[in-house]
Swiss-Prot record:
Additional notes on this entry: Present with 16300 molecules/cell in log phase SD medium.
Keywords from the named record: Cytoplasm, mRNA transport, Nuclear pore complex, Nucleus, Protein transport, Translocation, Transport
Stated family: Belongs to the importin beta family.
Gene3D superfamilies: Leucine-rich Repeat Variant
Function: Nuclear transport factor (karyopherin) involved in protein transport between the cytoplasm and nucleoplasm. Required for the nuclear import of ribosomal proteins (RPL11, RPL16, RPL25, RPL31A), the poly(A)-binding protein PAB1, the HO endonuclease or the tRNA and snRNA chaperone LHP1. Indirectly involved in nuclear mRNA export through its PAB1 nuclear import activity.
Protein name: Importin beta SMX1
Organism the protein comes from: Saccharomyces cerevisiae (strain ATCC 204508 / S288c)
Gene Ontology molecular function: nuclear import signal receptor activity; small GTPase binding
Self-association state and partner proteins as the record states: Associates with the nucleopore complex. Interacts with LHP1, PAB1, RPL11, RPL16, RPL25, RPL31A in order to import them into the nucleus. Also interacts with the nucleopore complex proteins (nucleoporins) NSP1, NUP1, NUP116 and NUP159.
Pfam families per the UniProt record, alphabetical: Cse1, IBN_N
UniProt xrefs under InterPro entries: ARM-like (IPR011989), ARM-type_fold (IPR016024), Importin-beta_N (IPR001494), XPO2_central (IPR013713)
């Protein structure tokens, strides 16, 4: 028996103001929760009205957490089977009793969900049926709460494992339909709470797979009619009197939202034939259901347009998304095509226009306005975002319709130009700009677009009456990625953009001006000479802006400037680096110290900005390779590693890798701060880093190639990590280990862990890329041929290795050179091992083939570096393989300094002079064509 009074006392103490008392009480409760009966006692408190509400609420939270954590009986503190049965029965009773308590009810439903999700075979259907069939609203409501949780818990059940949830739906949905029919027209809050639960239950019932219940078409029609009725149902006066922001929180508005949402989701999910969805079903949806939905949606659009029906942003988003899907599906497009221009003019375009609410937001909260209308990471499920997608889709899928849209927006531009004092025309001007910017990719007449920029955008940037139009015009520039041909228009645009960036005090104008500057600079290299003198000033302003407002656009602009104006920024590099480091550490420290356990939108924004800052630092290091930045930037990497900031590991390691390469270039050695960071990283593998090995692999490759040849202090600790990862059974980690070991063999002329790597590579269940072990074997043969062959023999791997090698096709310069050098190494051996001698024919022919293929590989490597197309008739699969391999060509290795053509020439010349018999034997392995090819190569090398 638990100590009830002691537990109750502890619960009360968790609500006092003294942190020390709270902590002690929580520690005691943690010990109490291990005792049988603890969970039942918490439920006693929750269900007893005699206890104070705050005590009951706190107990409910502990109850929920305990059940979520300990429902598994196998746990040491797991709840026992007999207690579970009692808890389940009493949870339902407590929920029914407290369904009007807005504080306790949500916690109880979460608790029930925790049991359902925990793979518990808890059949709630009989209980739900009794509650729903009672005819009493006080029972129907908790019944629907339970149905909602049941559908939610089984939403991912796949075909073949849906028998239970299908039987529940078959039994309960007819009752639910009757309830919905009875209260569908009601406008009171409770009735709409019930309708809300009905719609959400439908959503989760159909989320992943179609319930068997809906195999009968008339049942689908019944639910569609219910949804359509709720979509067009006007809101009561009391809801319309609420502020729009508060209005969207009302359950009656949410019912409308999910009316549209479920219909949209249904079409998005069920528009293709699958194993479970028949052609007959799809035909019924397309030929019967969708036409009915569209007919009603068109009525809703008309009512919304004449203000007789108010729709929330979410409802509009789902409505537009449904229409968008109809545009993409060829069988449905004829249903919507005759109405497309009306849809554009009456729904899509108005959603893209400014309005009184958006302007009020700009005046009241510039930061939130910028986030809402210009932060691509925040747009999400809004009607203007859906409308922008709709416009882009028309350009992509139905380009013939642009002939109707473009004259419309041109007319808006012209009318605003003639009547710019009309605020309603200014609102429409924003819609025209947003429409235009989403069609840039589909307009093949640059001169037409440049004229629009000259005639309409330039004047908008010059006025200060409508600052929302200045911001939108700047965004329009930022979204145009083509090079300008008219230097006069380009000069005007840049000058006005630059002026707005420096002088405006309107935040969205400053942010979008920065983005526009980036786009103009990236797309128009011809203006770089004129711009270069202004770059330090722009960078200073960007740094100031980024301190007061967190958005990744600013980091992207800084990165673009650093990449293209490294010489101009070099004198300011250390100051710039210090500023970037200061900003990053400020954000990172705030994230580390954040007491909240939840991940908020603000956290995401901070992480995005911090990642952008790290990327800018990396670009600085790579672009300003003559500037020593190691001392300035190393603290950033150290902070990320020591504080285990997983969100930034990849970017921090990229920065460290760039710093390591920079150190090698500047000093021809690894600077002490890099070694210190390597020490910290190796230490972190004792705690958290082993799970993120892949992120570190690029740095390990670089340190192996550039650092270990000079200093072997950390060789053994790294090899221990690599050995552990070979045992991890994580395929991509193992492949990275083999890559690192390959570079280790080349740079250190040693072959550690090869035997272990062979054993792992033969595990077919891992599905490793066979090229990994082939390249590692080749590198080891290059480093220590005799020892490598001996290990292969001992592991019974020789035949396997050579078979895989001869069957693989490599495309990179690195891989071809490595193979040539390995073959030469084997052919040079005074006594060819028995395991290799039968392969001399294959090796000699492969040597000539590889040498012949090398010039093309070099040209392709240079083409990739210069951004040009690859040479030769490569299949798409071969091109993909090449681009995977070409990473090897971008790294500096010991092979870079070896001229393999010269090596081949020297080998055959020396062999001919020193061992004519062996020379003849090798030459005779070649047919006449290959002999001629070899002779051409040898003559070419001797002449050059």
């Amino acid at each position: 028996m638990v100590q009830e009074q002691a537990i109750l006392s502890c619960i009360e103490q968790t609500m006092v103001a003294d942190a020390k008392i709270i902590k002690e009480a929580e520690q005691q409760l943690f010990e109490f929760q291990k005792q049988p009966g603890f969970t039942s006692f918490l439920l006693n408190i929750v269900s007893d009205d005699n206890f104070a509400l705050n005590v009951r609420l706190s107990s409910a939270i502990y109850l929920k957490n305990k059940i979520h954590r300990s429902w598994d009986t196998k746990r040491e503190d797991g709840i026992k089977a007999d207690e579970k049965l009692s808890i389940k029965e009493r949870l339902i009773e407590t929920l029914v009793k407290n369904c009007e308590n807005n504080h306790i009810r949500p916690i109880l439903t979460e608790t029930i969900n925790g049991i359902l999700v925990g793979q518990e075979d808890w059949d709630l259907a009989p209980i739900i049926k009794n509650l729903l069939s009672s005819g009493d609203a006080s029972y129907i409501y908790p019944g629907l709460l339970l149905l909602f949780q049941l559908c939610k818990a089984h939403r991912w059940d796949m075909v073949g494992s849906r028998d239970y949830i299908d039987s529940v739906i078959e039994e309960l949905f007819p009752i639910v339909e009757g309830i919905a029919s009875n209260i569908g027209s009601q406008t009171d809050y409770r009735s709409n709470e019930i309708l809300y639960l009905i719609l959400k239950s439908f959503k989760y019932a159909c989320l992943n797979n179609l319930p068997q219940y809906f195999s009968q078409p008339e049942r689908i029609m019944s639910w569609v009619q219910l949804h359509l009725y709720l979509c067009s149902k006007p809101l009561p006066v009391e809801v319309m009197e609420l502020d729009p922001a508060d209005r969207s929180l009302d359950k009656r508005v949410k019912v409308n939202k999910w009316g549209f949402g479920n219909l949209n989701r249904f079409l998005q999910r069920y528009n293709k034939i699958t194993k479970a969805i028949t052609k007959e079903f799809i035909d019924y949806i397309f030929n019967t259901i969708v036409p009915i939905i569209l007919r009603e949606f068109f009525k809703d659009i008309e009512a919304w347009g004449n203000n007789s029906l108010w729709l929330s942003d979410s409802s509009l988003y789902f409505l537009i998304s449904f229409l968008e899907k109809c545009v993409t599906i060829d069988q449905l497009y004829p249903l919507i095509e005759p109405h497309l221009q009306i849809i554009f003019e009456n729904v899509i375009f108005p959603c893209l226009c400014a309005n009184e609410q958006s302007i009020e937001l700009l005046e009241d909260d510039q930061e939130e306005y910028t986030r809402r209308y210009f932060d691509i990471n925040r747009e999400g499920s809004t009607p203007d975002a859906a409308s922008a997608d709709f416009i882009f889709l028309i350009g992509s899928k139905r380009p013939e319709k642009l002939n109707n849209i473009l004259p419309f927006i041109n007319d808006i531009f012209t009318r605003f130009d003639a009547n710019s004092s009309d605020i309603n025309m200014a609102f429409k001007e924003e819609g025209a700009l947003r429409t235009l910017s989403n069609l840039f990719s589909f307009i093949d007449e640059p001169s037409v677009l440049e004229n629009i920029f000259g005639h309409f955008i330039v004047p908008l940037l010059s006025q200060d009456k409508y600052m929302f139009l200045v911001a939108r015009s700047l965004e329009t520039i930022a979204l145009y990625s083509e090079e300008f041909k008219d230097m006069n228009i380009l000069s005007q645009l840049f000058e006005l953009t630059y002026t707005n960036f420096l002088n405006s005090n309107v935040l969205p104008v400053q942010i979008e001006a920065a983005d526009a500057i980036k786009c103009l600079i990236v797309s128009n290299p011809q203006i770089h000479p004129a711009v270069s003198a202004h770059v330090p000033g722009m960078m200073e302003k960007l740094l100031k802006l980024s301190k007061i407002f967190e958005i990744d656009i600013l980091s992207e602009v800084m990165e673009a400037l650093v990449e293209r104006f490294s010489d101009e920024l070099s004198p300011f590099a250390k100051d710039l680096a210090s500023n970037l480091v200061e900003q990053f550490l400020r954000i990172a420290q705030a994230l580390v110290e954040n007491p909240s356990e939840t991940y908020s939108a603000s956290d995401q924004e901070q992480e995005i900005q911090a990642s952008g800052l790290l990327q800018t630092m990396t670009t600085m290091v790579m672009s300003m390779n003559k500037v020593p930045l190691i001392e300035s930037l190393a603290p950033v990497v150290k902070f990320v590693v020591l504080h285990a900031q997983i969100s930034f590991i990849t970017e921090a390691v990229d920065l460290l890798d760039a710093l390591t390469i920079s150190s090698h270039l500047l000093y021809n050695q690894i600077a002490p701060p890099i070694w210190e960071l390597l020490h910290d990283i190796l230490d972190s593998f004792q705690t958290y880093a082993m799970d993120y090995f892949e992120a570190y692999s690029i740095f390990f490759e670089t340190i192996v190639m550039t650092g270990f040849p000079q200093d072997q202090t950390y060789v053994q600790p790294l090899l221990e990590i690599l050995s552990a990862k070979l045992e991890s059974e994580v395929d991509y980690d193992i492949e990275h280990v083999m890559q690192i070991l390959m570079y280790f063999a080349l740079s250190m002329r040693d072959i550690p862990l090869f035997s272990k790597a062979i054993k792992v590579s033969t595990n077919d269940e891992l599905g490793l890329d066979s090229k990994c072990i082939v390249k590692l074997g080749l590198a080891n043969l290059f480093a220590k041929p005799i020892e490598t062959l001996q290990i292969m023999e001992n592991e019974g791997f020789t035949i396997n290795f050579f078979t895989n090698w001869f069957n693989e096709k490599f495309y990179s310069v690195f891989a071809i050179k490595l193979q040539v050098l390995v073959i030469l190494t084997l052919l040079k051996m005074p006594e060819v091992p028995n395991s290799v001698s039968p392969l001399l024919n294959n090796l000699t022919n492969k040597l000539v083939e590889l040498t012949l293929s090398l010039p093309k590989a070099i040209r392709n490597r240079d083409a990739v570096t210069e951004g040009k197309s690859l040479e030769g008739d490569l299949t798409p699969e071969e091109e993909e393989e090449y681009f995977i391999e070409c990473d090897d060509d971008m790294k500096e290795t010991v092979l870079d300094q070896i001229n393999v053509f010269q090596e081949v020439h020297t080998f055959f010349k020396n062999l001919q002079n020193e061992d004519a018999g062996k020379y003849e034997k090798i030459i005779n392995y070649l047919d006449e064509s290959k002999r001629d090819s070899l002779q051409v190569i040898l003559e070419f090398v001797s002449q050059h």
